[in-house]
Structures are given as structure tokens and as C-alpha cells.
A protein has these predicted regions:
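Membrane-proximal envelope and lipid/glycan-remodeling enzymes
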Residues: 1-411
């Protein structure tokens, strides 16, 4: 393929088609990537199929909402759950961000897909995110065999795998956020286009609102290195403000206020309601959340599988201990400072939130807001050292996550 391609003629569809053609040509020459994509797709699809056989089938909550939206309404015509539901004037609304509903919209005309839409959508988003673990590893890691260890960590050693196979609309927001954050990391390494950086952050925030905070370190870094700061500021502001406007409009049409997310007024189970009464976000929740995140463990039961994780969430050290490698990344490097700032800023609302690690979830699922940044830091740290200890931590991460899969199927 020539190093420089001729200018593309025509409108946006023609340019998009040409972009796809060029990327397909690059992929054909990358056998490693093709094999990686096949492995991820096969293992994710196989695990999803097995998990689906151990679950009840029926109408999918987000599929119902997508069909209702296609008919011009934003309330739910029928309910599969009463959790996180806001009832106003006899109408029922799901207290949730917008983006998890969007992948269901293309399936609305195909009624035969509705019963298993949750498996299809989650698998498609999760597999795409798993594929991107390889290009992120290639860009941030030391290369060589470490690339494949890192890619395996990203796709099979984090909660990305266990959240994907559940086919749960709550988890879909995390899958979308990981996918978009990986794209953000790739764009940051490659071209650093301010408008695209902001667009990816804005879209990620439409899945997980906490991620809007990473606009601060990434935006400041772009402004610091820009020769035209006004233009860069505008390029950053437009997509971010657009995402905020979409969120505000979505809240307004459902709850009558652009600042009402619904989480503070939705019906939830009594134990969670008591926690929420202390504050949707509050310092009161921090000690318990941090204790779960760092120290939550397993209990032993008499039947297989014998190790039972807490339904409130358990330690990241018992799901993805390889994140410890990230602490070896030097804080003197500008990139590492941006990544650590992103980790800290997204972790703050996670630990202030009343919901713990995410009810009835293997691991601490809210950690997935910042795990992609830790993943990049792990890759960077491996440039200085990639020995037996690092391999053991990555291997343990995969083992713990695979156990999570076993638990979800046989619990």
C-alpha cells in the first residue's frame, strides 16, 4: 500500500467508504490482528452462548424502550423490572443514560431478533472493545510478546469479558464506555485531533456520565501543546457541550427538568434506598466502597463453584491484580500524568456513589470507568520491566476473570 494516498473526492459517504477500504486493506496484511479478532470473537460468542443457556429468555428491557422510542414515546410500554424506574403520571421511565438504548434501535424492524437482542448487542459491543485491546497494547506497550500478554489482559483479564457475556442492559453502558475509551486512547496516541478527542469523551459520557471528567486532563494537555488555543478550545467545547445538551434534553423529555437524572427519585430496593437517603453522592459511602474495591473477597460454600463473591462487589485485586503494574509507570511523564489524572477524576464519583460495586455483579463493575486508563499505564510500565512477576499478575487476572465466568454460569 502506498505511503500517501491520493486525495479523496466526493461527499462524506464516499470518504467514509474510502476510509473503510483503506483500513480493510491494512487489516488484510496484518495476520496477527486477524487471528486476534477471530480468537476474541470465538471465545466471547461461545461464552455468551453458554451463559445464555443458563438464563431465562424473554423481552429485553432496552429492546422494549427502543421500540417505544421508534414509535415516538420515551416511556416504557411494559416493564421487565421495577428497579431504577421513575413513575410520573402513570408513565414509567428508566433512570439511565441514553447511549445503552441506541444499539437496539437498528433491531427494531426485526422482531425475530427481539428475544435474544440483549445477547446480540452486548456481544457486538464487547467483542469490538476486546478487539481494540490489541491496537491499544501495540501503541502503549513495549512490543514483542508483551503485546499479546497485554491484549489478553484487556480482553480476558478485566471485567469487560464477564460484563459482556451477561447480556445485561445495565452492563452495556460499561461496555460502550470501554469501547469509546479505547478509541480515545488510540486517537490520543496517533493524531490527537481535538474535535475527535472531545467527541469520543462526549459519547463515552452518554454511556457513563463520570467520563465527562476526563475532558479536563485531556483538554488541558491539548491546549498546552496547541499553537492556536482558541481554535482548539472551540473544537473541544462543541462536542462536549453537544453531549451535555443531549443529556439535558433526554432528562427533560422524561422527567421535566434538564438537571434531573432520575436516579434520585427512581424506585430501588430497600437496602439501596437507605443508602441513597444518605446522599446519591456522599463522603458517607466512601469507606464502604473503598473497602469493597480493595478488600472485598470470597466466601466458601459447599457446592460448586465453591468460592462465592460478594453480591455487592469485591476487590479489583481478586479480578484484575495486573493493575498493580500501573504503579511502576513514572509520574514524570506527561502522558502518565494525564492517564493518572483520568483515573483519579473518574474514581472520585465512583467511590462517592451510593451503589457500591454494582449490585449482583462479579467484581466491582464501576471500576470499568477508569480501568482502560490503568490498562494503558500497565502497558507503559511494561516498557521498563516485563518479567515473571508481570506475567504472573496478568495470568492471575485472566484466571480470576475466567472464574467469574464459571460463577455466572453455575451459581
Amino acid at each position: 500500500m502506498p505511503m500517501f494516498s491520493p486525495p479523496m473526492q466526493g461527499g462524506l459517504p464516499v470518504r467514509a467508504l474510502e476510509w473503510v477500504r483503506l483500513r480493510a486493506a491494512q487489516l488484510r496484511n496484518d495476520r496477527g490482528a486477524i487471528v486476534w479478532m477471530a480468537i476474541v470473537a470465538a471465545l466471547y460468542c461461545g461464552a455468551t452462548f453458554v451463559r445464555s443457556q443458563a438464563s431465562d429468555w424473554g423481552p429485553d428491557h432496552m429492546m422494549i424502550l427502543a421500540t417505544d422510542i421508534a414509535q415516538g414515546r420515551v416511556d416504557l410500554s411494559s416493564l421487565t423490572t421495577i428497579n431504577d424506574i421513575v413513575t410520573i403520571d402513570g408513565r414509567h421511565y428508566q433512570a439511565m443514560s441514553l447511549l445503552p438504548t441506541v444499539p437496539y434501535l437498528p433491531l427494531v424492524p426485526f422482531e425475530f431478533l427481539w428475544p435474544f437482542s440483549r445477547w446480540v448487542v452486548s456481544a457486538a459491543i464487547g467483542i469490538s472493545a476486546g478487539w481494540l485491546a490489541l491496537p491499544v497494547a501495540r501503541r502503549y506497550g513495549p512490543g514483542g510478546s508483551a503485546t499479546w500478554w497485554l491484549a489478553s489482559l484487556g480482553a480476558f483479564g478485566t471485567l469487560l469479558f464477564t460484563l459482556t457475556i451477561e447480556g445485561n442492559f445495565y452492563y452495556l453502558a460499561h461496555l460502550e464506555a470501554v469501547l469509546l475509551t479505547f478509541l480515545l486512547l488510540i486517537e490520543w496516541h496517533d493524531r490527537r485531533r481535538a474535535w475527535l478527542i472531545a467527541l469520543l469523551i462526549g459519547l463515552a459520557a452518554l454511556a457513563r456520565p463520570t467520563l465527562i471528567l476526563v475532558a479536563v486532563p485531556f483538554g488541558l494537555a491539548l491546549l498546552a501543546e496547541s499553537k492556536d488555543r482558541v481554535r482548539t478550545a472551540v473544537a473541544l467545547a462543541v462536542p462536549l457541550l453537544g453531549a451535555i445538551a443531549v443529556t439535558a434534553a433526554w432528562d427533560f423529555v422524561r422527567f421535566g427538568s434538564p438537571t434531573e437524572t432520575g436516579y434520585g427519585i427512581a424506585w430501588i430496593e430497600a437496602p439501596l434506598a437507605r443508602l441513597r437517603d444518605q446522599g446519591l453522592f456522599s463522603l458517607v459511602h466512601v469507606p464502604n466502597n473503598v473497602a469493597l474495591f480493595l478488600g472485598g473477597g470470597f466466601t466458601v460454600r459447599e457446592t460448586f463453584p465453591w468460592l462465592e463473591p460478594s453480591s455487592l462487589g469485591h476487590s479489583i485485586l481478586l479480578t484484575t491484580p495486573a493493575v498493580l503494574i500501573a504503579f511502576a509507570a513514572s509520574l514524570r511523564d506527561r502522558l502518565n500524568q494525564i492517564l493518572w489524572a483520568s483515573v483519579i477524576l473518574t474514581a472520585i464519583p465512583v467511590f462517592l456513589f451510593y451503589g457500591g460495586g454494582g449490585a449482583a455483579t462479579y467484581g466491582y463493575r464501576y471500576e470499568m470507568d477508569f480501568v482502560p486508563f490503568l490498562f494503558a499505564l500497565v502497558a507503559i510500565a511494561l516498557k521498563d520491566r516485563f518479567g515473571n512477576l508481570e506475567k504472573i499478575l496478568i495470568g492471575l487476572s485472566v484466571v480470576f476473570v475466567v472464574y467469574g465466568y464459571v460463577w455466572q454460569v453455575y451459581k
